[in-house]
Design a protein with these regions (language model features):
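Residue-identity detector for glycine
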Residues: 3-6
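Conserved PLP-enzyme active-site core in the AAT-like
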Residues: 12-14, 18-311, 316-326, 331-346, ...
Length: 371
């Protein structure tokens, strides 16, 4: 067979023994969570059927539970948050329609260009504060209808914001953005991969953050510890259209109850423990602030993400590699930052262990002049 010509891409999914070693403290992401024992049992015992025919009882039960708990008319299980976001684009927009979005939004930065390659939308970047688009900037970006312009269609929010260091879009800010969108007849989608963190940080029920949007994605693989899956939620009419788009992009599933079973357990056991992860992140930030070479303002940590400036120690890629060799796995954010994320399976002992190892690495790097 002939090969496909074009650029090569690094393999990111190859098993790395340094990451999976029992002694490693993996703070790379909250996607590193593993299914709980109750999830594993639920997967084994779940009643199953063919979800493509709407006959998997566990999927049907989970979607009903999720819609009720999240305060929406309907919910649909999909394979990933990226797929849920893509489906939302396909339902809300037609090719060339205009999407108003922050430059660092996950859908722009980390979803392989699907918004252009598959959905064919026209992104218009709107000024933001820590990733959250500003209402006045959105107002200024929306143009009067004209044959020279794409059709304005969708406003995209992300809460919490990944590249905004896990920052929270507070309720009054979100409502102001929603009001501008409504004024111009635009739909609003919320990338709520970590919306449970956003709600917990504000002392709100998650329903309040989903109440003013037309659709939202909620990821199951982060703080909720599921092995895969996400929810797309919205009105019954929206989800009816979304089921067709899910099939279109290859997301139709058969005995998907094994995924839904984990989601049911997550909703029963884990929805109310999110603040534990935030407290762990604050302990981590406080400890790092006292180590020479790690620059961080602990007050900047709003949820479970800790972004640290390591420029004083060298390039972030080199610092991340040194930490990995010491058994602390972090995410590299070149050229100066690393990211650490707390989650269900990061214990207090792990936080203390990570701080000790990181202090040793910092001391070693300070003693070794950069080449």
């Amino acid at each position: 067979m002939r090969g496909i010509e074009g650029p090569s891409f690094p393999i990111l999914t190859r098993r790395d023994p340094d990451v999976t070693a029992p002694t490693a403290i993996n703070l790379r992401s909250d996607t590193q969570t593993l299914p709980t024992e109750r999830m594993r049992q639920a997967m084994a015992e779940a009643p199953l059927g063919d979800d493509t025919y709407g006959e998997d009882p566990t999927v049907l039960r989970f979607e009903a539970i999720a819609a009720e708990r999240l305060g929406t008319e309907a919910a649909m299980l999909v394979l990933s948050g990226t797929m849920a976001n893509l489906i939302a684009l396909l339902v809300h927009c037609r090719p060339a329609d205009e999407l108003f979005v922050d430059a660092g939004a996950h859908v722009v930065y980390y979803e392989s260009g699907g918004l252009g390659a598959v959905a064919g939308v026209t992104p218009t970047v709107v000024a933001s504060d820590r990733g959250h688009i500003l209402p006045d900037a959105l107002q200024a970006a929306i143009r009067r209808p004209n044959i020279h312009y794409p059709r304005a269609r969708l406003v995209w929010l992300e809460n919490t914001h990944n590249r905004g260091a896990g920052s929270v879009m507070h309720m009054d800010h979100q409502r102001a953005v929603e009001a501008v969108a409504r004024e111009h007849g635009l739909a609003v989608h919320l990338d709520g991969a970590r919306v449970l963190n956003a709600a917990a940080a504000q002392g709100l029920d998650v329903r309040e953050l989903l109440d003013g949007v037309d659709s939202a994605m909620v990821d199951l693989t982060k703080g909720l510890s599921c092995p895969l899956g996400a929810l797309l939620v919205g009105s019954s009419a929206f989800i009816e259209q979304a089921r067709f788009r899910r099939r279109l992009v290859g997301g139709g599933m058969r005995q998907a109850g094994v995924i839904a079973a984990c989601g049911i357990v997550a909703f029963e056991d884990l929805l109310d423990r999110t603040l534990d992860d935030h407290r762990s992140a604050h302990r981590l930030a406080d400890g790092l602030a006292s180590i020479d070479g790690f620059e961080i303002d602990p007050a900047s940590v709003e949820t479970n993400m800790v972004y640290v400036d390591v420029g004083a120690l060298g390039r972030s890629t080199d610092v991340a590699a040194a930490l990995k060799a010491a058994g602390v796995i972090v995410s590299d954010r070149p050229p100066r930052q690393i990211r650490l994320v707390t989650h269900l399976q990061i214990t207090d002992e792990m936080i203390e262990g990570a701080l000790g190892r990181m202090a040793e690495v910092a001391a070693s790097l300070r003693a070794t002049p950069a080449v």
